[in-house]
Design a protein with these regions (language model features):
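The feature marks long extracellular or luminal low-complexity segments
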Residues: 1-328
Length: 329
């Protein structure tokens, strides 16, 4: 006669026999899961159903703290995360444990401009020296996104590459040049996300020049007090106004003027010239190797007209009512 006998797996020797990654590289959106399969057996390799396996995941990943094995001794572990990178998942039972790493990737579908900051400002407006900004692109959960194309615009005539590509840390440098002094708004955008920052370009004092010299008042009296006036304008090589520049001034034909004048914020300065000598005076304004000249005219002051001299040039004429003595005033 025959009888069947049954042997059961030894739960006292339950161990993690295997831990295998079955799905990897899920998006770090807190919803899509990486998965692993754990197998529990006894010391002799017999599968164990209904065993509680403890699970831990690092790097801020989320998983159920325990899972229960199926009749085949297997159970699936789901792991989600909002943090891109590697997470070590550990399954343990009794004193037995195994670990495997899974990887979460940043979500390119939610790419956004997380940061735009000025890293160098106040460059010279010479079309070569650059102001720089750094842009950072992340997903909705702040994970850096590499290889992303960021569109860039700059206002006020500044020049910038139309696009930049992010590095592995999600950042990219944006150089901006200009020949126009002043403020330029730089805007970086990706998808529907954008940020703007202002950078400032300054006029190039190294190329200061007399851009213009204009007579604004002429024909003053040569009384040493009433002035003819001119306006000088100083710019750099690209026509940007230069404030605070010292302009040297000369006036000939005995006219008097301050030897230097300082430009105002708009790059202009008024030059006053007086004289006690009627006639034309050439006024020259210069800075560096640049100069311009203009003529101003001083007129005699009729208000102070006087007999300067009276000289007899013919005397002793006959008293015939016709022959004249003459004088010159």
């Amino acid at each position: 006669a025959s009888q069947n006998v049954m042997f059961i797996a030894d739960v006292r020797t339950a161990k993690i026999a295997d831990l295998v990654v079955t799905r990897d590289n899920s998006v770090a959106d807190g919803a899509m899961a990486n998965t692993l399969q754990v197998k529990v057996t006894d010391a002799n390799g017999n599968t164990l159903a209904g065993q509680t396996v403890s699970v831990l995941a690092d790097n801020s990943a989320t998983t159920a703290p325990t899972v229960i094995t199926e009749p085949d001794g297997m159970v699936e572990i789901s792991v989600t995360s909002q943090t891109a990178g590697t997470s070590a998942v550990t399954a343990s039972i009794n004193n037995s444990s195994l670990s495997q790493s899974v990887k979460f990737i940043a979500d390119v579908s939610t790419a956004q401009i997380a940061m735009l900051e000025v890293t160098q400002d106040n460059a010279v407006a010479d079309g070569a020296m650059a102001n720089t900004l750094q842009v950072k692109v992340t997903d909705a959960f702040g994970n850096a996104l590499s290889g992303q194309t960021v569109s860039v615009l700059a206002g006020n005539g500044a020049t910038v590459a139309p696009t930049v590509i992010t590095e592995p840390d999600g950042t990219a440098e944006i150089p901006v040049t200009s020949q126009t002094a002043g403020v330029s708004a730089v805007t970086a955008s990706i998808n529907s996300s954008s940020q703007s920052r202002n950078v400032t370009f300054v006029a190039d004092v190294r190329t200061a020049q007399i851009a213009d010299l204009v007579v604004i008042k002429d024909g003053s009296e040569a009384d040493g007090a009433t002035a003819n006036t001119l306006r000088a304008r100083v710019t750099d090589a690209f026509g940007n106004a230069l404030a605070g520049q010292t302009v040297s001034v000369l006036a000939d034909n005995g006219a008097t003027t301050a030897p230097t004048v300082i430009t105002e914020p708009d790059g202009t300065v008024e030059i006053s010239v007086t004289s006690q000598t009627a006639g034309t005076s050439a006024v020259t304004a210069s800075i560096n190797n640049s100069s311009q000249s203009r003529n101003v005219t001083f007129i005699a002051d009729v208000r102070t007209a006087q007999i300067a001299d009276l000289v007899v040039i013919k005397d002793g004429s006959e008293a015939d009512g016709a022959t004249a003595n003459t004088l010159r005033a």
